[in-house]
Regions:
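Conserved alpha/beta-hydrolase
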Residues: 72-91
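Catalytic nucleophile-loop/oxyanion-hole region of alpha/beta-hydrolase
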Residues: 88-114
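N-terminal cap/lid segment of alpha/beta-hydrolase-fold proteins
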Residues: 19-45
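Short beta-strand element of the alpha/beta-hydrolase
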Residues: 49-57
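The alpha/beta-hydrolase serine catalytic core
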Residues: 130, 140-165
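The serine-hydrolase catalytic nucleophile loop
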Residues: 58-70
């Protein structure tokens, strides 16, 4: 259980960081703070024609995209990360982490990206991957990297209801 606690503490530390310059290997990682349709966002990396949309999972935040950006940016990508409702800079806000809230928001973020970059890819985790698959199923993506995606929400909920407390 200690490992889980360490990951939670690391996520909390990452989620407290703000935009600016982050150390990425031996060079500073350029970040820009943005707001897309009222959604707090960070853009990592120097100007490019390619971008990854980074969508975190439960208990995550846009700042946790930094380790991924440290890999993607040297490969010629920028990374656009957003805070889902009730996460990161949106903690305590009135928006709830519900499909009918998160899906239209991710559609708006995709539209923002598609207007600015030639190639849009997705990197999403867990519940963020599920929301992204709902929002972007008809959108052209260059690629998708899904980490622990929820692919069958109904089955997940049914199984969770059978867990012993």
């Amino acid at each position: 259980m200690k490992g889980g606690l360490e990951v939670k503490n690391l996520n909390q530390q990452l989620c407290r960081k703000k935009g600016g310059r982050h150390l990425a290997g031996d060079a500073a990682m350029i970040t820009q703070k943005l707001e897309i349709s009222g959604i707090p966002a960070l853009l990592y990396g120097k100007e490019s024609r390619k971008v990854y949309l980074y969508v975190h999972g439960k208990m995550g935040c846009k700042e946790e995209a930094l380790p991924f950006a440290e890999l993607a940016c040297p490969a010629g990508y920028q990374v656009l990360a957003v805070d889902l409702p009730e996460h990161g800079d949106r903690r305590g806000s009135s928006e709830k982490l519900l499909p009918w809230v998160a899906v239209p928001e991710l559609e708006a973020v995709y539209s923002y990206a598609a207007e600015r970059w030639k190639n849009v890819s997705l990197r999403a985790t867990s519940i963020g991957a599920w929301f992204s698959m709902l929002a972007l199923q008809e959108k052209p993506l260059r690629g998708a990297l899904l980490l622990s995606p929820v692919v069958d929400m109904e089955n997940l909920i049914t199984n969770m209801m059978q867990w012993q407390m």
